[in-house]
Amino acid sequence: MKLSCGTSFAFLIMFLFAAQSMHVYAGSFHKDVQIHWGDGRGKVRDRDGKLLSLSLDKSSGSGFQSNQEFLYGKAEVQMKLVPGNSAGTVTTFYLKSPGTTWDEIDFEFLGNLSGHPYTLHTNVYTKGSGDKEQQFHLWFDPTVNFHTYCITWNPQRIIFTVDGIPIREFKNSESIGVPFPTKQPMRLYASLWEAEHWATRGGLEKTDWSKAPFTAFYRNYNVEGCVWANGKSSCPANSSWFTQQLDSNGQTRMKGVQSKYMVYNYCNDKRRFPRGVPVECS
């Protein structure tokens, strides 16, 4: 079909608008995030903005946030966690909306004594309510090398992956009354902070401040998502993550990780839910 000049121009405008709405950040910590707390404890480490560190001492932790908000997206980063005795520390990478009825999707790494594994804590909040925790002990030492952690959030599901391996899927079950984050745009956040009252063995192990400052590293930050601007998000479904689901191989890999490395699943906690586990668990 031959296009007129006017039709071609209109098509170009539509294409440019779609390209702006579905934005890919091949991540620069200089350009795409701001270190919003920590009083100098968060630092971009290289000229290209590919490596950032967050530190924690007895006075304060630190954190950064994305400049843009997104309504759906795929966010990933490589992290190397605090080595040695990290008891009482929490290192995070998560999505969150503002307000008192916020939505949130969490990767939280709970520190431990030397020689004991980190606990990877995942959770999903909708309208300020969470209580959907799954926890894992990783199959590697996350303090030795960088590993890739990814959150894929689309209208159908949320997928958590570690080094490309799915560890958790939280499906949209609004049809049976389970809230799902579909309406509130979120920013990407990362932080390193102290939570010795609960983070390690329920607060039994306290932070050894003689080991401070504690430092975690982030690199190769990347976000592909639907940018929220001027009260709306136009998001064409032309990117693989927007309709991503786990095929049979992905399901098998996820179940394998869960059977070997999952240490807590709210869906199995009958003591916590004596009247029956949440409906999405069945």
From Swiss-Prot:
Residues covered by the GH16 domain: 27-218
Residue runs in coiled coils: none
Subcellular location: Secreted, Cell wall; Secreted, Extracellular space, Apoplast
Catalytic activity: breaks a beta-(1->4) bond in the backbone of a xyloglucan and transfers the xyloglucanyl segment on to O-4 of the non-reducing terminal glucose residue of an acceptor, which can be a xyloglucan or an oligosaccharide of xyloglucan
Modification note: Contains at least one intrachain disulfide bond essential for its enzymatic activity.
GO molecular function: hydrolase activity, hydrolyzing O-glycosyl compounds; polysaccharide binding; xyloglucan:xyloglucosyl transferase activity
A Pfam entry, by short name: Glyco_hydro_16
Listed GO biological process terms: cell wall biogenesis; cell wall organization; cellular response to hypoxia; xyloglucan metabolic process
Main location: secreted
Active site: 104, 108
Signal recorded as keyword: yes
Site for Important for catalytic activity, residues: 106
Gene3D superfamilies cross-referenced by the UniProt entry: 2.60.120.200
Chain sites annotated for binding xyloglucan: 108, 121-123, 131-133, 197-198, 202, 272
GO CC terms: apoplast; Golgi apparatus
Protein keywords: Apoplast, Cell wall, Cell wall biogenesis/degradation, Disulfide bond, Glycoprotein, Glycosidase, Hydrolase, Secreted, Signal, Transferase
Tissue: Root specific.
Glycosylation sites: 112, 238
Keyword Flavoprotein included in the entry's annotation: no
Disulfides per UniProt: 226-235, 267-281
Function of the protein: Catalyzes xyloglucan endohydrolysis (XEH) and/or endotransglycosylation (XET). Cleaves and religates xyloglucan polymers, an essential constituent of the primary cell wall, and thereby participates in cell wall construction of growing tissues.
Family under the similarity heading: Belongs to the glycosyl hydrolase 16 family. XTH group 2 subfamily.
The name this protein goes by in its record: Probable xyloglucan endotransglucosylase/hydrolase protein 18
The species this protein was found in: Arabidopsis thaliana
